Amino acid sequence: MQISVNEFLTPRHIDVQVVSPTRAKITLEPLERGFGHTLGNALRRILLSSMPGCAVVEAEIDGVLHEYSAIEGVQEDVIEILLNLKGLAIKLHGRDEVTLTLSKKGSGVVTAADIQLDHDVEIVNPDHVIANLASNGALNMKLVVARGRGYEPADSRQSDEDESRSIGRLQLDSSFSPVRRIAYVVENARVEQRTNLDKLVIDLETNGTLDPEEAIRRAATILQQQLAAFVDLKGDSEPVVVEQEDEIDPILLRPVDDLELTVRSANCLKAENIYYIGDLIQRTEVELLKTPNLGKKSLTEIKDVLASRGLSLGMRLDNWPPASLKKDDKATA
């Protein structure tokens, strides 16, 4: 199979192998040599750092003033409880932040199912253990759940309002990403006689709030959106190209006097040897502002008059001035 050096193979086969409800293996092939690592590493970084999700960012526990406390009748200390709260897989439908409550007493296991939920809040892992209570134990707490992206340490959420925050409101370092683990390998692939191609295999596991296949789709969309700016890359000062036909637009051959500019503006243009509209539209704003006695007010007037005729400054004309105009100039001379 002969392929031009300017052409690249594009993946023609994608396979999704569902290992569990929260884990999947995605295979993409064939890829040009080296593109397996290029795409795999880019997607891996986006999945780990840029996927939005929800997490507990603050907890307030009755009888607890700081995270180094212990609660009577509770097997875990406060630090262990906070670590367990980080394992909650929560989905918010419609809101960016909510406050939830948990209240339980007596011997038994405290799980995510004991949290009192609002109508637009969902906990995907209700069996997740938060603490274990003895017969004389009780656990009452308020949890603030927020939507975010990536990893956010507690220090980054501190503000001037922290001084007025009541004692006992414990801030948590939060990992919002629904992706728990991702790894990729690049294997060999073959298409007809070409054996030096790549096959990308991504092994992805989430916390259940996001389907693995949907996570890959979102990561690819983010990457596509970020690279789109390079696809449409253009220079800031690129002149506008005027489509040329067999004959030049007659309006470009008319003298600038036909624009009915003020005497000041017209004299400034003639002083710069700008006699025809075709000469004028090829000048830029910067060039005109360098003209003696031509200020921003005159420049605005010129731009408005040209715009009324469908023209603008900074346009480019091929084969200007035309031969007929040169002959007229010589005859006048």
Swiss-Prot record:
GO MF terms here are: DNA binding; DNA-directed RNA polymerase activity; protein dimerization activity
Q: Which domain of life is it from?
A: Bacteria
What's its catalytic activity? Answer: RNA(n) + a ribonucleoside 5'-triphosphate = RNA(n+1) + diphosphate
Q: What does the entry give for GO biological process?
A: DNA-templated transcription
Entry annotated with the keyword DNA repair? no
Which residues lie within the region annotated Alpha C-terminal domain (alpha-CTD)? 248-333
Give yes or no: UniProt keyword Glycosyltransferase: no
List the residue ranges of the region (Alpha N-terminal domain (alpha-NTD)). Answer: 1-234
Per the UniProt record, which EC number(s) apply here?
Answer: 2.7.7.6
What does the UniProt keyword field contain?
Answer: DNA-directed RNA polymerase, Nucleotidyltransferase, Transcription, Transferase
Q: Which GO terms describe its cellular component?
A: cytoplasm; DNA-directed RNA polymerase complex
InterPro entries reported for this sequence: DNA-dir_RNA_pol_insert, DNA-dir_RNA_pol_RpoA/D/Rpb3, DNA-dir_RpoA, RBP11-like, RNAP_asu_C, RNApol_insert_sf
Q: What is known of its domains?
A: The N-terminal domain is essential for RNAP assembly and basal transcription, whereas the C-terminal domain is involved in interaction with transcriptional regulators and with upstream promoter elements.
Query: What assembly does the database describe for this protein?
Result: Homodimer. The RNAP catalytic core consists of 2 alpha, 1 beta, 1 beta' and 1 omega subunit. When a sigma factor is associated with the core the holoenzyme is formed, which can initiate transcription.
Q: What does this protein do?
A: DNA-dependent RNA polymerase catalyzes the transcription of DNA into RNA using the four ribonucleoside triphosphates as substrates.
Q: What NCBIfam families is this protein classified in? A: PRK05182.1-2, PRK05182.2-5, rpoA
HAMAP family xrefs: RNApol_bact_RpoA
Q: Tell me the protein family, please.
A: Belongs to the RNA polymerase alpha chain family.
Q: What is this protein called?
A: DNA-directed RNA polymerase subunit alpha
Which organism was this protein described from?
Pseudomonas fluorescens (strain ATCC BAA-477 / NRRL B-23932 / Pf-5)
